[in-house]
């Protein structure tokens, strides 16, 4: 093999939280220097076998899907075998189906609408379905022989199992089905964001596969390993700008009318409200927009016509956007997987640069979610303490009566065979993947609220950027000046200026003396801070109409000495 696995690490006696322990003894990591998945793995494929699953971790745009179409599918067809591709969202599935139709000269490509293509799954030796359709696909008796001829099962966007676990209680069951029912096929998992799903994937492949073959058929198992191919990530094309509220980008949108914006809101209501506040230059889509012309344009042509597209997480794993005019992405999430998946929807061309406007969560919202996660974990612990199915069923029924979907998602019912094998029984189970995700998120929020780290520091590490480089506030202040050069500032512009000055003041090493009043600082207070900031040669002056304006100003020598000392 071209990329030899790293040696197993020496065993360290260390207490690791259960939600943070990765089965490193099962994963064999291959550090791949290439930036092309197809070029790097073309000579690896022939070494793969069903006992050893494959995880391809590569940044969006490195050709994971191209590798499937140009390497895996031709190999399967040449051996008269089949390929099953499982994708996350319907939109992603449509894009893949269009590409398959082009490859096979399928006449349906020019006859069907996008809605019609969504309903197509059968492409002969190739089938494309969503994760949500998997159980129905496995129950289809007429497809039994087709499934027996599978050579590859491709689980695209494999972070689905954890990213969707908080609103899809069957993610764990879907993962179990893949590792169990497709144990004789080569299973290829692909994602750009693996950190949350590494542990569940490893445990499912190690446990369920053995259950499927080792105990059921009694076959002798050869040595198994999970091949983990890790490709280099490059985030140099992104400039990070942190904002306190999504409203702050409105002034920048007005200043950059020639640039397109992709805005991810954390709720439908907020998205619709924000889109409406921008007027005719913005459009809004969400999960209910599948029949809209805007959605059809995105799916088929991978671009939008408006200056601003406001959406929810419906796009985070669904649609790719190829449009050089999109130079700004606004993101309202603190979840690492979701954030990077949103960023990845915009595919970059050579020399392209994109500004990421990332909304920092407030302490109030962090505290509220920390309490929610703590309450949910306590419920799961209460469920685990119950010994009988009758007790567990009563416990869950009480939750269902309460009607809180955030709590109901923690449990589900499963039909299994009774021990006497003559009848079935209904089991009440906990959503183990949801428990795992909640525990990880609770730990992350706890670090933010305790002061152990900051949101900016964490996000900067996700993009491999030093914190001081993540947002050059001085450049933003200069941009603000150039846009509003010595002109009266509006009521909307003044809060932006206040924020820039306070951030620069703190970055210069000073402690903000009025942290609870930064949103109401007066002209003199802001000028006092400007006088102490290195290279901040600006001052706020007042016009005859009592309005503020930002002007160039070289502060006196005393201040200059302070600047040189910093």
Predicted regions, residues:
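N-terminal helicase ATP-binding lobe
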Residues: 1-190, 194-308, 314-341, 345-566
